[in-house]
């Protein structure tokens, strides 16, 4: 009999023949070795599609019971983090040692391993995705053996943003830097017309633009400045006079400190407080990453269909990402602008809009976030990743029987 487990948003039901929550790496390796096929790992469940669905005959591996390892080496400035650890937990430990991650995503409650495996990112023209600091990957492969992959090896380009296709990540080693403080400055009513996107995007260490596409412009700008940088000069919009939430009408107390008040990096780079624990999300999410040189044209394309987009949209966030070296990284090989859409939780209403949005953006070579809602065909995805053939070969090398290849991955790799 299959067991049903839902994701965080509740829009996907994972049907698995078995669900295991191993408590040790040895127990995990034993479960993997005994599994016939369809082994998929999940920790925080923050994906919005079937990327982690093993199917009715497969095995779902929940990693949240594994030891919450966060071993900091202050001399090497690295941290070894277990496969089930979330960023909020990791950040507190790292900061206590006087060190920092270079960037974080908007939500600190997501797992480290799942985030880097799907290409998740924060913002900043000089900041790479969350996979960028990874310096070693530890995997349990199909036969239950442990494999370590580090930079300099031919396999490393496919090992971090791996979509779960190579094995189950038991630990990652990440590079760190000295701890720093950040002030978060919010502005309102930034016009789209006449926007100098490059200047705006580079105005802070991390910059996010928010709109609901009901008007041609941005209702909010979140500018995060390291305190060792100059105060932001941002004459294009008005400073916010009240605390804000990215979604209009939502309580701002859930968000990290605003008004430029300096604070530790891990309490400012995310948009949401770690102590605010979200329950199942009343939302769906999509995101498209495309060359930053096309940012204004892409925004104009969305603006032209805003009457279609706005009725099912909660908020849209525009961010930037530096180029990524991972073969399946959505910002692989290019300076990137990322257009993120938080939809209402109504799949039937949202999917037609997603299709229309993808048509509007198609000319700009968009790559959808691997873990969010999209309708882009597997054939189109293969054409947008020049190293996908190398990744396919690596997956077959480490998992020759396809034990970790579910329907989502089979369509992508074997089509």
From Swiss-Prot:
Alphabetical GO CC annotations of the entry are: membrane
Q: Name one Pfam family in it.
A: FAD_binding_4
Cofactor binding comment, as recorded: Binds 1 FAD covalently per subunit.
Q: Reaction catalysed by this chain?
A: an alditol + O2 = an aldose + H2O2; xylitol + O2 = D-xylose + H2O2; D-sorbitol + O2 = D-glucose + H2O2
GO molecular function per UniProt? D-arabinono-1,4-lactone oxidase activity; FAD binding; L-gulono-1,4-lactone dehydrogenase activity; xylitol oxidase activity
What EC numbers are recorded for this enzyme? Answer: 1.1.3.41
- Judged by the first EC level, this protein's enzyme class is oxidoreductase
This molecule's function is given as:
Oxidase that performs selective oxidation of the terminal primary hydroxyl group of several alditols, with a reduction of O2 to H2O2. Shows highest activity on xylitol and D-sorbitol, and to a lesser extent, can also use galactitol, D-mannitol, and D-arabitol as substrates in vitro. Is not active on D-glucose, D-xylose, D-galactose, D-mannose, D-fructose, L-sorbose, L-fucose, myoinositol, glycerol, ethyl alcohol, and meso-erythritol.
This protein is called what? Alditol oxidase
